[in-house]
Amino acid sequence: MPEFNIVEHTCDICVVGGGLAGCMAAIRAGELNDRVILVDKSNPERSGCTATGTDHIWAYFPDIQKTEGVSLDDLVEDHVRSLAKGLINKEIIHYIAATAYDRILDLEGYGMKMRYADSTLPGNFRLQYQLHSCRNTLHFDGRDVKRVLTEQVRKRGVKVADRVMINDLLVHEGQVAGAVGYGTRDGKLHVFHAKAVIMAAGRPNRLYKTYSGLVFNTRMPPALTGDGKAAMFRAGVELINMEFVSIPGRWSSKNLVRGGGLPGGSYQPCGIGVNGLDEVIRPRNHEMGQWQGPATPFGTDKTFMGELKAGRGPIYADMSWGSEQDQTYMHWAIANEGSGSCFHHLNQQYGIDFRKHKIELWPLEPEHSAAAAGGPIIDGKCQTSLPGLFAAGDEAGGIPQSVVPGALTMGHLAGESAVAFAKQMTHVPPGGNFDTLLEFSSQVKTRMHGDAWQEAQSFIQNVMSDYNIAYRSGTMAQRGIDSLTYLKQNMRLSAANPHEMTHCLEMRNLIECGEIIFRGTIERRESRFRIFTRLDYPERDDANFFC
């Protein structure tokens, strides 16, 4: 077995993941404790789902919602019933709704612009309808939110270990003792000994084939490969709802996938949907400044797929509608949301103009995010079933559609909770072993002329796309498990450098997540709305599967 250079780190709080949740956890923990380390697979300045910005966040705005007759409890109940369909951690979603406004004020205090002179609402906030039945989604200048948060992380004395991919947790006598990761640039193994760990590594992307055929052309960051969920599972942490799938049903720009509302967020108020005959098939759902109700989802299989099957494709987003004020607002919003700035590059480079050119749309690949919300079950303090281990944001299970406010608020709460836990301990526990990770990495490192990680990636995506979406059933899921087991037992990955080693470690985690999803599918013998369907169990079974 070849020797790896091992770098030891010791801290009280180890935060895994530098997205919104991880940064907020590090900020809050850093305010209460001077021995905090933030570990990020990339660079926290531009990592996570808001790496290139976000233009919206929902919250309860007391001065606005109260005048409209909406209480905090009303908003929570709306979220529970309409978005989560009852399957949600009510204590956490109440906390999110109650404190999201405070986190917005935090962002404003960090220097982000949240108020606008053209708004007539109390506080000069630009609010839209989006997810809920009340107007409570704030549009703001969020392009550089990650840079701002990373600056705040460093100001609090938090040590940042970037370019380190956490692979496994250290466990000692039934309690978390830290985490171990691989340096994606230096090729070293980094061992973090800690009293408490906050897991905020995000969702498992890259499980399914993309419509463009490009592995990394995904709506959300392709670097998110379920590393945290796989590590927690290997450590014996209880996971829930991993079998749930969000999307298909949403559409995005063809061959240039981007996140963000389409058009319920960034694209309103200009966007409409038209077919190949230029017939309007998805009208505008409100005029600028004249919101009538919650935004209509722009792309649904029922409408858009129906047009394609009827021979009336392609499908386009036509943003030429609306006044100059509408256009200005839309361009501002898109520039702050996800990879929307790519459109401005296309405008400058190729003359693409929303006022003149329609944007072709195509379905998005399936995801395990948003409405799906699979991950570790957490209590009201964000603690998982493993003492000392906390989870926040997309990492946590059972909080559908918590999105940006969920990341900010749960990160803040997890930071406080982890510090409180660490205070009870007199010393950092001795580290557990990571022999399995060391053995896997050593084999990949020394193997000559082995399998490329791309081959394993293609295998995984074929298996997940074939057996877990359109034709999902118990027998199909078992076939999926058998296929992933064959891959795990027979693949002989090799890596010539740290970059390739990182991708090989990602394959290890994707296989783990895929198998968890299939096993969850077998156990959930029912169908539940759009997030989970089984052809052999087409009916909902609340008696056995509703909590």
Identify the meaning behind each predicted range.
Residues 8-11, 185-196, 385:
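Core beta-strand elements of the Rossmann-like FAD/NAD(P) dinucleotide-binding domain
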Residues 1-10, 34, 43-45, 52, ...:
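Glycine- and aromatic-enriched mobile tails/lids
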Residues 13-38:
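N-terminal Rossmann-like FAD-binding beta1-loop-alpha1 element of flavoenzymes
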Residues 42-68, 249, 257-260:
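Conserved N-terminal glycine-rich FAD pyrophosphate-binding loop of Rossmann-like flavoproteins
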